[in-house]
Regions:
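Beta-strand elements within well-structured catalytic alpha/beta cores of enzymes
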Residues: 6, 23-28, 66-67, 89-94, ...
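Extracytoplasmic/secreted proteins, especially bacterial periplasmic and envelope-associated proteins
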Residues: 1-8, 17, 45, 88, ...
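Loop/turn elements at helix/coil->beta-strand transitions in domains of secreted/extracellular proteins
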Residues: 18-24, 64, 128-129, 144-147
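C-terminal cap/loop subdomain of S1 sulfatases and analogous C-terminal strand-loop tails that border
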Residues: 32-57, 74-78, 82, 87-174, ...
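Intrinsically disordered, low-complexity polar regions and short flexible loop motifs
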Residues: 181
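Short glycine-rich loop/turn motifs
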Residues: 63-65, 172
Length: 223
């Protein structure tokens, strides 16, 4: 049903002759839920070959479908293995509309980047490598290239970032090579101590400098 109706939407955009000025994005917020019942529904998902599922920061909870349709602007049938994240959708749409990225009140930088150069080049211009950091209920992750750090430090530490930093400093995290081990089954912390130390310090530095911003309070009409 979903596939049929997405097809109807694309057909309608073509019929209205607005396809060259319309971007359609299909993406999920998380990997499939592998549990049944009230939380998972009747038909549990399968995220193989990845470990984990929805509500985890293993790859089974993070890796999702991501498709973009922009007729005449993005190469049809292009497939990319470059790493991207949800923040990139916002930056990409702004770039397509010719709107500069916001300055975030002049403090924290925009984390997403436009994917248009990558898509318009048919993948010849790679997406720059960067660290991707995840946190959900004490499940911490950092990915850079094929390497990924992971740990569960407990839910009671979030969003108390100072307590979380102290916990991370005194915790042993797992180190995976996703290129060779997409199921996150082999901890390489002891085999690759230099990689481990660099990524762990980057993760600690990130949470030590978390400064969540909220948008300005909306004004009330008539006041």
């Amino acid at each position: 049903h979903m596939d049929d109706n997405i097809g109807k939407l694309i057909d309608l955009i073509d019929e209205l002759n607005i396809s060259n000025n319309t971007i359609v994005v299909f993406v999920s917020d998380n990997g499939g839920c592998t549990m049944e019942g009230d939380f998972g529904g009747r038909y549990p998902g399968n995220n193989g070959p990845f470990r984990g599922s929805k509500a985890t920061t293993y790859q089974g909870g993070l890796s999702v479908p991501f498709l973009i349709n922009w007729k005449g602007r993005v190469q049809r049938g292009m497939v990319s293995d470059d790493q991207v994240m949800h923040c990139d959708v916002f930056a990409t749409l702004l770039d397509a509309a010719g709107i500069p990225l916001p300055e975030m009140n002049g403090q924290n930088p925009m984390r997403g980047m436009s994917l248009l150069p990558h898509m318009k080049s048919g993948g010849k211009r790679p997406v720059p490598e960067r660290s991707m950091i995840f946190e959900l209920w004490g499940n911490i992750g950092l990915r850079k290239g094929d390497y990924k750090l992971w740990a569960n430090v407990g839910r009671e530490f979030t969003p108390d970032w100072k307590a979380l930093v102290n916990k991370l400093k005194n915790s042993d995290l797992a180190l995976f090579d996703l290129g060779k081990d997409p199921s996150e089954s082999k901890d390489l912390r002891e085999q690759l101590p230099e990689v481990y130390d660099v990524l762990k310090q980057e993760l600690i530095d990130h949470f030590a400098n978390v400064n969540a911003e909220y948008p300005p309070k909306a004004s009330t009409p008539g006041k």
